[in-house]
From Swiss-Prot:
This is Polyribonucleotide nucleotidyltransferase. Belongs to the polyribonucleotide nucleotidyltransferase family. It catalyses: RNA(n+1) + phosphate = RNA(n) + a ribonucleoside 5'-diphosphate. It is an enzyme of class 2 (transferase). One of its GO terms (biological process) is mRNA catabolic process. It holds the Pfam family KH_1. InterPro entries: ExoRNase_PH_dom1 (IPR001247), ExoRNase_PH_dom2 (IPR015847), ExoRNase_PH_dom2_sf (IPR036345), KH_dom (IPR004087), KH_dom_type_1 (IPR004088), KH_dom_type_1_sf (IPR036612), NA-bd_OB-fold (IPR012340), PNPase (IPR012162). Its EC number is 2.7.7.8.
Amino acid sequence: MFNIHTKSVQFGEKTITLETGRVARQANGAVMVTYGDTVVLVTAVAETSMRAGQDFFPLSVHYQEKFWAAGKIPGGFIKRETRPSEREVLTSRLIDRPIRPLFPKGFMNETQVVAQVLSYDPDYPSDIAALIGCSAALALSGVPFEGPIGGARVGFIDGKPVLNPTVDQLAASRLDLVVAGTRSAVTMVESEVDFLSEDEMLDCVMFAHESFQPVITAIEELVAEAGKPRWVVEPVQVNEALLAEMNDKFAAQVTEAYAIPEKMARYEAVAQVKAAAMEALGTIEVDGQSVKRSEEVASLFKKIESRTLRQNVLQGKRVDGRGLTDIRPIACEVSILPRVHGTALFTRGETQAIATVTLGTSRDEQIVETLSGEYRDRFYLNYTFPPYCVGETGRMGAPGRREIGHGKLATRALTAIVPSAEVFPYTLRITSEITESNGSSSMATVCGAVLAMQDAGVPIKAPVAGIAMGLVKEGDAYAVLSDILGDEDHLGDMDFKVAGNADGITALQMDIKITGITREIMAKALEQARAGRLHILGEMGKAMTTHRAEMSAYAPRIHTMKIHPDKIREVIGSGGKVIRSITEETGCAIDIEDDGTIRIASSDQASAEQAVKIIKSIVAEVEKGQVYEGKVVRITDFGAFVNILPNKDGLVHISQLANRRVQNVTDVVKEGDVVTVKVLDVDRQGRVKLTMKEMEEGAAE
């Protein structure tokens, strides 16, 4: 019934196993990947023909985590997996990015890759197994995929790279790096970094590339045994005669249009040239009948655009007139919105972002439910890319995959500089509203967010800046571009985003569309990026050099205090009675952690200080010899009970009421009287003995 083929290879501390032929046999390609106790099923299916009029490659990648894979039931009212989580979206993008460039031009059949986590080992993240499985499934399927590729995660612990670190190792690592690539080249890099140098980063990238070579070998061996016949895809035929005619008539006009530095004016000029080409050549007469070839003309026009830009770049001429290493003009403003806790407007050329910071309490932390359990984020960033920022109309609503991905990249870039909860006990929500875009909006988000945090009074560890780099390569000739425009990104060979400062890198993301990117080219790009981000930091420093000493008047004030864990129940009270009364009396929000840490949030200083005073009095220990002012709360025949601290009464025996013989307690004190008492003793059971005699003697003296 089954024709099972299996390949295993040592991959870090564990063995990775690839199996095909047992599950999902009706898919074009299917692989079960096992790493530790993590098991991922990956399938690849492609339509046998393309849709009529299809002009792009409809590839979709879906990474799915099933809660039952970790022995869990989803929380909430709906007890099943519904829309993709942020982690699923990010992992889907992580897989999509290195495989998409490896399909040949002209292949436009709808292709779908699905990776499902069937068993989850909390020690090892499942994304690398899913990435490798997608590569294997596509290679087995017979679709024209120029793979296989491999992938690996690398940490940096005690000054050395670590292959496929465990979750615990990652917590102690200064690096979380994912690299994917073919046998000969790196094609994708994603990372979160704690200030590693350019050389250290490059070493880790190459270490990852070398480490996943045995995995590529295992996939190739599996394909040799069980792979399906490769689909034949006819190479795209270029109508050389039509291309030559278009070059003669319109190439010079395209060159003129691409000399216009302003984006919208350039787009309008290019659109006019394209419209003229479509009108002149979009229809031809064949045997007396009109035949449309507008799609062919549009495709060739794009080739002319690409060639024009790329040739200009290789000659040192960029679209907007800059040199290869020049950064666009930068303008930085802070405190632009009066009621927001921290704001910045960061403008770099025709890319602009409004960054905001909102400070909250621990109640505002983001609760995230994952296969490994529930956790809380006290720092999160939301990136929004509305259609108006590029002069278009379009969908508005929930964030798409691109917005989630760009937001996560900016989050990674900033994580290393966010102060700990002990230093700054606030929840930080950052938003980035892209108001103009012409390339590198995610890096504008990083720069704007740093300024907004400083404006909000957040004591960041150090300012960082982000920059997007590009590459144009033809044969052995290449040019690395700093601070790329949207056109340079679209028509170039590499998108290379780096964030950090003079001390090192905090985030690196790289997507390469071609093969043959050498270590030398990557090193040049990293060094050029370093110079660029230092220039940007200098411009940012003109707006703010450090964080504000005072936070916004509209931001909450959080005071932190520590009590003994045994005292927590006294502060909370029966059914929350005590803490509720403190909140009502002071107007403060109070959070208590299991270790006795108390955070008091208030809109004004006086209320917070009042809450602190009340809590201190609740948890205070009665000390022998200490003098208190208290209220008489109960009268008995043998004495008076006086409340000296919240929830703490002491007894003034009738013999200790005065320096004379007292017949009746009420002759000296009555219920409700405020008296001064001194502690005589506290017995083992916590009972407090008080005296008023010594107070009387002190007053007499």
